[in-house]
Design a protein with these regions (language model features):
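Non-heme di-metal
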Residues: 1-180
């Protein structure tokens, strides 16, 4: 992680986790993002022609669903969302869960670009969660959950990077999608 990104994450983390009400909203956003990722992964299971990737996408989708539940539970522990508000958020999320013009993220991007997207997003999450943990944010229970989730995130980063590297070796121009 570059020093500028680390500085940004450190400052943003302090604000996001220490301002009253912000931790709940941040955890809620994480829960929704993880649920959307779960749907993307299950769509990839159906769309890929690569049998070796089906198992990885399926495992990844199960992880994302579990993470969504963990983050939603942390939101409830903080006491933010009432049932009516949660239902409204859920309905909006289901309408916006990666389906654009009737196509999933995997269908719009194709497998190589999808894997590059997954790699970048998962690597960002690992960096972000590590900054939170280094700063001792926000509380012990959430930190324990982040540590558990990080184990899955490392798997996601590893398999997606391995696949991106295979596409590179096959001559596909992956650098445009990946940050250096």
């Amino acid at each position: 992680m570059g020093w500028l990104r680390r500085c940004y994450l450190t400052v943003a983390s302090e604000f996001s986790w220490r301002v009253p009400g912000r931790p709940q909203r941040l955890l809620g956003a994480f829960a929704l993002a993880e649920r959307g990722s779960m749907l993307d992964m299950f769509a990839a299971v159906e769309a890929t022609k690569r049998r070796d990737m089906r198992k990885k996408y399926f495992h990844h989708g199960l992880d994302e669903g579990r993470h969504a539940l963990i983050f939603a539970e942390r939101v409830r522990a903080f006491g933010l969302l009432g049932r009516a508000e949660a239902a409204l958020e859920d309905s909006g999320q289901l309408l916006e869960a990666g389906i654009v013009g009737g196509k999933t993220l995997f269908e719009r991007m194709g497998e190589p670009e999808f894997l590059a997207f997954v790699y970048v997003a998962e690597a960002d999450a690992v960096e972000q969660f590590n900054v939170y943990l280094e700063r001792g944010l926000p509380d012990d229970a959430t930190q324990a959950q982040l540590r558990a989730i990080l184990k899955d995130e490392v798997f996601h980063v590893t398999y997606s990077r391995t696949e991106v590297d295979k596409y590179r070796k096959d001559g596909l121009p992956m650098d445009a999608t990946l940050r250096k």
